[in-house]
Regions:
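Glycan-recognition and catalytic cores of secretory/periplasmic carbohydrate-active enzymes
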Residues: 23-515
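C-terminal motif of bacterial Sec signal peptides marking the signal peptidase cleavage site
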Residues: 16-19
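Bacterial N-terminal signal peptides that target proteins for export
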Residues: 1-9
Length: 515
């Protein structure tokens, strides 16, 4: 089957644009086009994003209410009395992730009622925050009862068991990501102020000569980078790097602390922890031009893609560690392939693309997006997989919710942001990464460009791209030729197509074949 990529005659593909003179904060050399600038018009993703807004986010908040997650904030903040109501000390994080998803969703589907609910919820979170900025409802509630009810995973003193399982810093990482998303969506600083107060405490408590416990479950690194971008305060960036650099060399492989991060060559341990850490390292590599980090994550990416990834793009072969096994040990029936790990691997591959501009990273991203991630949520958007095995006897069914609800809340925050993976820019270079029908507005080298796609992907391989610049000029359009259109199932030779199609794609510009 031929995959036709046709460019309409609205424009000549090269357009001369002035170099952007605006000074930008050092960051990724390639920048994603924000999801708010890309309106999907397809019949595949657009309905799913709407379903996420209309079904997933409301039911996720409903379960947070009924399970006691929201009530924990009310008790910690003095609005109610009682003991900690939920199972895990990281249950706060689900609320933060759903706030993040709701904030993204508001920018596509404005909803005054939802925004008002967020205002009230954030007010409750603020009440639960202690005067010095500490926010961890399990401890705050336990201290109201003389320490009774403190989770066994938490130490009597703050932070000291975070390397193990307390998840104090994990919760905060998701708080910071939610706070930046909410501020960008609404312009309100209510949650951002809570996040800054918290991060200032973490910065005060952690560092050389202070607490040197590394995060047991990575994510705060990405959250701190987002906070740095939002505020310009470099201490948050420095703290993110500190948390990465204090890992290893004598820690557990389970949470990637068996070596210093710059010495690691293999993907090991818990796959969600791992991909969140690699994504945080990519952020630091981009902002600080850190070659040691870049070399490490490049080696690790190769280890994953050449021997530890499923044909669906899923990662994590074993349930015991919810993570990676030895190379080529990829059982189908017992495959773990956690939904959160698929989302984490999408984060990781997208960041590597933004560093290098190599389509192979989008090949992995696309494979995971349409398969191992997407299987994690039902078409009705109200039932979820935690693991996604490749073989089933029929007993493995999606669930409405989980006691450990990291996957539904992750889906709720990831799906609204999918349009942000379609395009990227670097000055006058525009990258078309995913083929999804859309209408987009792109700032290309300081000039506005309208770009649209008409496609029925993944059902059909024919794509028509139209470009309409605000004024005549020159730019470079990079069209990704997917690996599967070049007879490559995934980068490397782990998987091969049984049928090789030599004539697999055609590029036509203004009616002229330019292959």
């Amino acid at each position: 089957m031929k995959r036709l990529i046709r460019l309409s005659p609205l424009l000549v593909v090269c357009l001369i644009l002035a170099e952007c003179s605006k000074q930008q904060q050092a960051d990724y050399p390639i920048r994603p086009v924000p999801f708010t600038s890309v309106k999907l018009t397809d019949n595949f993703w657009a309905p799913r994003i709407r379903k996420n807004a209309e079904v997933t986010i409301p039911i996720a908040f409903s379960y947070c209410e009924s399970s006691g997650r929201v009530k924990n904030f009310e008790i910690a903040g003095g609005l109610d009395t009682g003991t900690f109501l939920t199972i895990y000390p990281f249950d706060d994080s689900d609320v933060f992730k759903i706030i993040e998803g709701a904030s993204y969703s508001l920018q596509t589907y404005p909803d005054p009622r939802l925004e008002g609910y967020l205002d009230t919820l954030i007010w409750k979170i603020g009440l639960a925050q202690e005067d010095d900025g500490y926010l961890y409802t399990n401890r705050t509630i336990a201290e109201k009862h003389g320490g009774k009810g403190l989770h066994e995973w938490a130490s009597p003193e703050r932070w000291l068991l975070d390397t193990v399982l307390s998840h104090e810093l994990y919760n905060l990482g998701h708080l910071y990501e939610a706070a930046v998303a909410h501020y960008q969506a609404t312009g309100k600083k209510s949650l951002l102020d809570i996040a800054i107060k918290s991060a200032d405490l973490v910065s005060k408590d952690f560092g050389p000569g202070k607490v040197t416990v590394y995060p047991g479950h990575q994510v705060i690194e990405m959250g701190l980078v987002k906070l740095y971008r939002a505020t310009g305060d470099k201490k948050y960036l420095d703290l993110a790097k500190f948390f990465l650099d204090i890992r290893g060399p004598h820690g557990e492989q389970y949470n990637q602390a068996q070596q210093k991060v710059v010495d690691q060559t293999e993907a090991v341990g818990h796959s969600v922890r791992a991909t969140y850490m690699y994504s945080g390292m990519a952020d630091i590599a981009a902002i600080e031009n850190n070659e040691a980090y870049l070399n490490a994550i490049t080696r690790i990416w190769e280890d994953i893609v050449y021997g530890k990834i499923y044909v669906t793009g899923g990662i994590g072969a074993t349930g015991g560690n919810e993570g990676f096994a030895d190379p080529f040990l990829l059982p189908n029936a017992t495959a773990y392939c956690e939904t959160c790990a698929s989302i984490g691997d999408i984060f990781f591959n997208h960041r590597l693309f933004l560093l290098h501009g190599d389509a192979k990273y989008i090949d992995v991203l696309e494979k995971t997006l349409y398969n191992s991630m997407l299987s994690g949520v039902s078409l009705s958007a109200d039932r979820f997989f935690y693991p996604n095995p490749l073989e089933s006897d029929g007993r493995h069914q999606r669930q409405a919710w989980f006691g450990c609800a990291c996957c539904p809340s992750n889906v709720a925050r990831f799906v609204p942001a999918i349009p942000g993976y379609v395009y990227a820019v670097k000055g006058k270079d525009i990258y078309v990464n995913l083929y999804i029908s859309n209408d987009a507005q792109i700032d290309a080298g300081g000039r506005n460009l309208k770009i649209s796609q008409k496609a029925d992907f993944p059902w059909s391989g024919e794509v028509e791209i139209s470009l309409d610049p605000s004024e005549e000029g020159r730019f470079t359009l990079h069209l990704r030729i997917p690996g599967w259109a070049r007879n490559e199932a995934l980068p490397g030779d782990l998987y091969k197509f049984s049928d090789q199609n030599k004539e697999s794609y055609v590029v036509v510009v203004n009616g002229e074949n330019v292959n």
